[in-house]
Amino acid sequence: MTDEIRIVQYGLGPIGAAVARHIVEREGLELVGTVDIDPNKAGKDVGEVIGLGRSLGLAVAKTLSAVLSQTEADVALHTTSSYFDLFQSQVIEILEAGLDIVSTAEELSFPWLDHPEAAAEVDAAARRAGKTVLGTGVNPGFIMDALPLFLTAICQRVDHIEVTRVINASKRRGPFQAKIGSGMTVEAFEAKMAAGRMGHVGLPESVAMVFDTLGHKLVRYESTVEPVLAERDLKTDHFEVRAGQVRGLKQVAHGYGKDGEFVALTFIAALEAGQDGDTVKISGKPDLEVTLKGTNGDIATVAIAVNAVRRVQAAPPGLVTMRDLPIVTAR
């Protein structure tokens, strides 16, 4: 094994490309290959595809096996899909190839609430391979779970946790603006909601992680998603939104224990939503309130995924979460 950690970037969408760029600039990490099924990317130089401005002498491969036929690797940084039914086979493939995994798949961050059988399959595959899998990101992975859990370290008692995240999506990347429903009619928004493909992915995972880590049994989980409508015509670099159309969403999740509500998470992401901000309120002994004045989700997701690589390499085999690792830092 070389001194540098050899990384394969699996998925070259906007986040994957940003991760790859960050790997290239980080000391102690080496980008040895990339995978993407997009025929417009396959075969091209990675530096060109990720917008690096220079050649890396690596061609984008269509398959992981094609990468590993040319080089050895230690870790895969996986950035393809949010949903277990779409990414599980990819994760199993990576593990069977003998690589540790850091993934930005939201449903992998704490999957035992909604996907217990699939989580058990991934965990078993990781243990068979002697490798580690982590799902992380800014949210889930930090703002609404790892951060409030870390803050409870200075509490003698925790009665209730409330986290509110507000994102002004006007200057965010196009796929994110699309993800929150920008430019949709209310009817189209509701139809996509009914199909289970609208709304922020990861709130159930965050609620479950907080409950489980603090030793509470999650008796009931409830969530609501509603569109945020434009009161006037809006335009971004990616969308034109008419008055009355959707400019974003508000999603609220509630986790109840035997004594009532214990966790409340509010996620608001909309065009022209005002000041970005993340607020954690803990009721207990003592009461705490911490506000971050705007966490850029794209930058933070890239950072935490890359920063987690060393922790994952040192972790025992299996499917792990952010609460299982030593504190992830910028080194």
Regions flagged by a language model, labelled:
Residues 82, 94-115:
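ADP-ribose/adenylate-binding Rossmann-like module
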Residues 1-97:
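N-terminal glycine-/serine-/threonine-rich beta1-alpha1-beta2 phosphate-ribose binding loop
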Residues 142-154:
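Alpha-helical support elements that line or immediately flank enzyme active sites
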Residues 10, 152-278, 295, 302, ...:
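Active-site-lining helix/loop region of Rossmann-like oxidoreductase modules
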Residues 103-104, 133-136, 162-163, 221:
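General beta-strand structural signal in soluble alpha/beta enzymes
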Residues 10, 14, 18, 71, ...:
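Conserved active-site and cofactor/substrate-binding residues in soluble primary-metabolism enzymes
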Residues 106-131:
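Rossmann-fold NAD(P)-binding glycine/threonine-rich loop
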Residues 271-331:
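C-terminal helical cap and adjacent loop that interface with cofactors, partners, or active-site loops
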